Regions:
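Gly/Pro/Ser/Thr-rich low-complexity, intrinsically disordered segments predominantly at protein N-termini
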Residues: 1-189
């Protein structure tokens, strides 16, 4: 019996770029690029979609009335980092008028929205959610709302590192990102 060992070294997987992500089509899936690695998830469930849409509607009404900027919904990707690339797609986002990308922009705008809304699904893991919040804040987001429909709570994260937890009787506040916007959690949960 031979005593020599054979070692096989596997090549590291090639990292994907934001441009390659644009060319990738995976029907009926939610995809993001995290530090060059493609992350594929199942579509969101009904409750997730309803909460996202309720809040997007309220935000859109406010933004249209004030001319503050634009609201975008799920599947809108934002390039938050390069080499390796990170492209995240929030459930709802607000971009202020001053930071709006050119309407002819193809691909993913290289910016973090001013306000990011993430609605948790039952299979979301806390560590992954915190990593996502970190990516948003490092990418330029000023305010991140993480809504948990199951527990009926919201965690609010700010670029200055502070955070707030709201119970189901709490009120979402646009703070200095969307002045004069507020809505009760009961109206969206």
């Amino acid at each position: 019996m031979p005593t020599d060992r054979v070692y096989v070294r596997s090549m590291p997987a090639a990292l994907m770029t934001a441009e390659e992500l644009l060319q990738t089509s995976i029907p009926d899936k939610h995809v993001e690029l995290v530090r060059g690695v493609l992350v594929v998830r199942e579509p969101a469930g009904y409750r997730h979609g309803r909460v996202s849409m309720e809040l997007a509607f309220l935000l859109s009404q406010h933004v249209k009335a004030t001319g503050a900027g634009q609201i975008v919904s799920a599947e809108t990707g934002f390039k938050l980092a390069s080499d390796p690339d990170t492209v995240r797609a929030p459930d709802v986002a607000f971009i202020s008028r001053e930071r709006l990308p050119d309407p002819q922009t193809r691909g993913f705008p290289a910016l973090g929205p001013d306000l990011v809304v993430e609605v948790l699904s039952p299979d979301d893991r806390p560590g992954e959610t915190l990593a996502k919040v970190g990516d948003w804040l490092e990418g330029g987001a000023r305010l991140v709302w993480v809504i948990d429909p199951e527990r009926r709570v919201v965690r609010v994260y700010r670029q200055d590192g502070t955070e707030t937890h709201l119970g189901e009787t709490g009120t979402l506040d646009g703070e200095d990102v969307l002045p004069d916007f507020s809505c009760s959690l009961t109206s969206i949960l």
